[in-house]
């Protein structure tokens, strides 16, 4: 307890929690040993994020070019500032976060958009795709046994929502997944189903490389076209045009998980090439507002039928239906608060 109080005291000295700090981050080193270095002049501001009860949640770095970057204290070993301020060593616990074993599968799995990684014995591939100029495009969990996407997750903020290029349309196998577990574009031929994006092409138009990565087959699900271009397409537009941070000066972030059901009992059947046809498509969304320093979350459930009725549900209910633990890297008290309710005013429903 004494250590925690000293830690919080150090945080309050280093930062004014009611305003942006003039302290800039020099480096962040994670417990995995991975280090992130930042130029002082490339940063717009830095904020330490606290829970309403005063517990430390993490650090948010706003860069001038790439938008915001989040680091959770539960994953940080230490932080060094561009000043004489001493390093910060975080304290605190999070029972269900992606732990050191999970991070061996994917070292990016500490990020807020990640669900809890698969804990069973089946072969899975946890893959992140990124570009040098725009950072992470999206991450996936791929079920090798089922040859199916379990989920795709990504962030949406001003710096990675630029519209610089057009849709590339080149469907190819994921280069990070062994061919024996992969799906090729021609496996959809004659199936009667579209290659339905999870991380949409329209969400990643910063560069040709970034957009091309959304056409990896690991980011697809067999989808009825009238669902893909109808109900689901309208939901994608709402995420992009309403719920994601709007405006180039926004400092907010939307954390997105998109997926479809692939487990027995929740599928419609199989294509002639044994691809699973999901019974439901769904989303888990977590919004961070910088101005209010708060989070809100919502689950979206879309039966895989033409003109199906969309359900807006809590994340707790979505977890019950899917068996997946979403936003597990949030501290437990924040996670429990936002996942058990829907703020109708924030989401406009």
Where are these regions (language model features)?
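Generic low-polarity alpha-helical segments
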Residues: 1, 14, 38-43, 256, ...
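Bacterial Sec-dependent N-terminal signal peptides
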Residues: 1-23
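Short N-terminal segments immediately surrounding and downstream of signal-peptide cleavage
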Residues: 21-37
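Short, flexible N-terminal segments of the mature chain
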Residues: 35-59
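Domain-level detector for secreted/extracellular nuclease and nuclease-toxin modules, and
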Residues: 45, 55-349
């Amino acid at each position: 307890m004494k250590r925690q109080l000293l830690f919080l005291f150090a945080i309050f000295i280093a930062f004014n929690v009611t305003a942006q700090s003039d302290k800039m981050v020099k480096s962040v080193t994670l417990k995995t040993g991975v280090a992130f270095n930042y130029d002082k002049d490339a940063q717009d501001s830095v904020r330490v994020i606290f829970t309403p009860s005063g517990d430390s949640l993490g650090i948010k770095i706003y860069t001038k070019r790439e938008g915001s970057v989040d680091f959770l204290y539960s994953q940080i070993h230490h932080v060094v500032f561009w000043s004489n301020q001493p390093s910060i060593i975080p304290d605190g616990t999070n029972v269900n976060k992606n732990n050191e074993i999970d991070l061996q599968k994917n070292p990016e799995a500490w990020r807020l958009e990640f669900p809890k990684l698969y804990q069973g014995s089946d072969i899975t591939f946890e893959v992140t795709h990124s570009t040098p100029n725009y950072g992470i495009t999206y991450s996936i969990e791929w079920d090798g046994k089922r040859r199916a996407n379990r989920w795709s997750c990504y962030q949406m903020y001003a710096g990675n929502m630029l519209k610089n290029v057009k849709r590339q349309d080149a469907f190819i196998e994921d280069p990070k997944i062994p061919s024996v577990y992969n799906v090729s574009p021609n496996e959809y031929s004659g199936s009667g189903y579209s290659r339905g994006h999870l991380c949409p092409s329209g969400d990643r138009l910063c560069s040709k490389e970034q957009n091309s990565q959304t056409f990896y087959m690991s980011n697809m699900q067999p989808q009825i076209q009238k669902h893909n271009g109808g109900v689901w397409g309208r939901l994608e537009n709402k995420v992009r045009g309403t719920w994601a941070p709007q405006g180039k000066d926004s400092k907010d972030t939307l954390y997105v998980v998109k997926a479809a059901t692939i487990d027995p009992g929740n599928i419609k059947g199989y294509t002639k090439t044994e691809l699973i046809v999901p019974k439901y498509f769904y989303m888990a969304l977590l919004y961070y507002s910088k101005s209010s320093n708060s989070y809100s979350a919502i689950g979206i459930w879309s039966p895989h039928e033409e003109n199906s009725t969309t359900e807006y549900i809590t994340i707790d209910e979505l977890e019950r239906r899917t068996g997946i633990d979403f936003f597990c890297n949030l501290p437990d008290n924040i996670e429990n608060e936002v996942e058990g309710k829907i703020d109708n005013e924030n989401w406009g429903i």
